[in-house]
Amino acid sequence: MCYNTCNYWGGIMEFKNRKHFDTYLNGLEFLGQGSQGTCYLSKKNNLVVKVFNDYFDNEETGYTEEFLLRFSNIKNNTFIWPNNTIKIENTIVGYTMPYKRAKNLCNINPLSINLDSLERAALNAEKDIKLVTDNSVKLYDAIYNILYTNGKLYIIDTLEYRIRKVSYEENRMMMDEELMLFLVDSYFDDFVNNDKLLKEMYRKSEVRGVDFLKTFRNKLSEYVGKDITKLNEAKCLIKKSSRYKYMRGFY
């Protein structure tokens, strides 16, 4: 029972009415709001509760349980699928998903991150991208939806993914692009643009993000005369720019 107002079993969290659901939400921690809805944290269950914007606008969402949970059987360590639906009087108003104690990549200072850990995380994520590709899942809008913590990457907001034949490279490209932007944009643009190989690799759709990370790290290490593990070890090469492409959560 959730505040004695809902039933919670299997794939459904069901509330009696809007008043009871709003009371339940008031007991959760607000996480953030996006184009699709608002997220809350249930610390008790270690769950993210995502409520569609349609609920707050008093409109029907139009989603079915089958659609929301369509990828939940693809077991992996990277993609955070919806695992339960939320209903009020048999109307779906949102879903739940496992909570991961991680930060959005765009809110992390790139200078402080361990490059070995980041590379390991990207390699593991690649395996899961291959897995979902083999299951005919087409990724969509992954940029700004990648979380990171201690050598692990997670990808959230998978609602707009589709069942469609797609190449592994096309699916991986979304992670590749954000990885490159995270490492370079508004910090090392001049360094990259002044190096022929890095300039050719940077943000090219056919370039693997992990390969760019390795090459970028090697080039920085050569310049500063030692093998760097964090970008702040090459801070002498930073030229901050206000003309950025990657929207970071700080500047």
Show where each model-derived region lies.
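Juxta-kinase regulatory segment immediately upstream of eukaryotic protein kinase catalytic domains
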Residues: 2-29, 59-63
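Catalytic phosphate/metal-binding cores of nucleic-acid and nucleotide-processing enzymes, i.e., regions
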Residues: 5-6, 18, 26-29, 36, ...
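ATP-binding glycine-rich loop module of kinase domains
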Residues: 24-85, 109-111
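Protein kinase-like catalytic core scaffold
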Residues: 47, 78, 95, 154-157
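Well-ordered, non-membrane alpha-helical segments in soluble/globular domains
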Residues: 59-68, 119-123, 172-178
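Conserved structural core of kinase catalytic domains
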Residues: 76-122
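Conserved kinase catalytic-core helix
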Residues: 108-148, 153
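C-lobe/activation-segment region of protein kinase-like
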Residues: 150-251
